[in-house]
Amino acid sequence: MMFTRAQVRKQKTSNSSSQRPRSSGGSTRHETRYKQSSTSSSGAGSGLSGASGASGARRDQYRDRDHYGKHSFELPRQHSKEEAYHRDRESSAGGVDRGERSGIGGNGGGVTGGGVYVDRRTRPRSITNRRGAIKHQKTHDINGHRFVAKFFRQPTFCAFCNLFLWGFGKQGYQCIICQTVVHKKCHDKLLGKCSGSVFTSASTILLRERFKIDMPHRFKPHTFMSPTFCDHCGSLMGGFFIQGLKCEECDVNCHKKCERLTANLCGVNQKLIVEALNHVKRGAREARDSPSTPPSLNPAYKIEASEEHDETSYTYSQFQKSGRFTAPATVIPRFKNYSVDDFHFLAVLGKGSFGKVLLAELRDTTYYYAIKCLKKDVVLEDDDVDSTLIERKVLALGTKHPYLCHLFCTFQTESHLFFVMEYLNGGDLMFHIQESGRFSEERARFYGAEIISGLKFLHKKGIIYRDLKLDNVLLDYEGHVRIADFGMCKLQIYLDKTADSFCGTPDYMAPEIIKGEKYNQNVDWWSFGVLLYEMLIGQSPFSGCDEDELFWSICNEIPWFPVYISAEATGILKGLLEKDYTKRIGSQYSPAGDIADHIFFRPIDWGLLEKRQIEPPFKPQVKHPLDTQYFDRVFTRERVRLTPIDKEILASMDQKQFHGFTYTNPHITLD
């Protein structure tokens, strides 16, 4: 016997004991969102039918993964939260007659006269497992092209230099609009605009106006007697007869499907033109910057040091200026570099697609650290080299704040990257939520205040965190929090600067990220609102049977606020989960006011909090430094070893991309 998704969902809902109780009218109102009703009361039939059609259309619309950034999660008609809430209560209590007058069924509740479902309340979902973050593939925008790193399953040639794309993993870049394939080193040298770009419908406007180049190819169908590759997309042209097109003038070959996408560069050698232009620019720059006086006497002339040396010197000098430096018994040498041989690995603390987190001991000492081990081939394959270097920078910066995870050092081998961080043996908040169900308001307030302190520190440095969740908030042995995992951070977001990357954990994503809009640090306050909701209530505020339905819920529904939480807690949750980011409570510059001034945090003495002088409401019962009771036993029972990488893949990796990763934090001392 076959069942529809709606019937299965209804059966699961009726059997679930973890969901909050609802009246019969509310349950019917929730179900009308997903299924068609063959029978309906008078005055409600047309409304419910319209709702079913709208819901079906919505599901069809979300099957396409390209809906991100097109506002597909918005409803045609929006109402305020209070308006929607009171309207639903009135419609459920008003009976059939009121439904006839307004176009809303007595039991339908959330269906407008136009047949569009606008019920803004959602049923919470219990937190049963960990949720991983997602990140859309990084794009490189050059001349209208949107290049992404890609793995090519067949021999492919570069459209710029006409050389073969070698290597394992993702060998080159391909434009997702016009399918042009190039090397990573060649993608920023293309002269022609993307022929499918939104900036122009003609691919040669820039060349025609600036370089006076507008030479269309004269393509003719051609039968190739040997294997031939397309000069546009780089792939093999298959078939036995008339496999593609060939230009009569310059012998450029392409698929029939690539003809309209090929730039008008007949007889033009892009590589030679780019080299000539670079030579001219280099000569002009050298003439402009050549000093008339010796470098030491010319204040405009600077000699830039390497990135790593500059950062270490800067942070060390800033630390000395703070006046809080006390000479310990033993100080880490300022430029000492550590290696994998300096540590003894003891246990596995966590594991993921990125690699592992291992508990390790510094040899000849009694100091223990958590070492995050990343496989280089995975980092390169996901094009996450920049994210890895950003994580190292933020971790080094976090040493200056008491509620951010502290970095000891970083080093690398041929196959792995290593982050040596402080060992926080109190577990993460996800572990404690699953153990306790939910936190008391006092405990949630304390954790929330320390998280706010850490977020404000990052925001003042122009950093968007973008991955705040229960899994990334850890407890130390005293019970204070530490924010960890900075791989999703975005740097240099000051004043009116914004970001637009689609990344984060789906349950914690702000509506503006889902809709593809530009955003700033306000997305972190939305994520904090979701996290605070989960700490106070023990459930996620938004739910959906799949990712698309979850995103629709986040953008259009309001969460349920139970009666057992205080009015102050309800007020701050509503302020944080405000869908209009301009009205969302958060930083001191927000029109809604500084979150630290909210009545919910009135019992907090922020001065004492910054000094870690407030007693935590919960202290982990850690018996000894190697106690791993607050970590998942599935991991701690595993054998401690690093996953090896294939020798051929290892030999093909470009190690230069990880230059500058090795670092020793001058702030950390051994007492």
From Swiss-Prot:
Enzyme class: transferase
Compositionally biased tracts (Basic and acidic residues): 57-101
Compositional bias ranges of the Gly residues kind: 102-116
Species of provenance: Drosophila melanogaster
Active site: 467 (proton acceptor)
Annotated InterPro entries: AGC-kinase_C, C1-like_sf, DAG/PE-bd, Kinase-like_dom_sf, PE/DAG-bd, Pkinase_C, Prot_kin_PKC_delta, Prot_kinase_dom
Region spans: Disordered: 1-136
GO biological process, one term: flight
Descriptive protein name: Putative protein kinase C delta type homolog
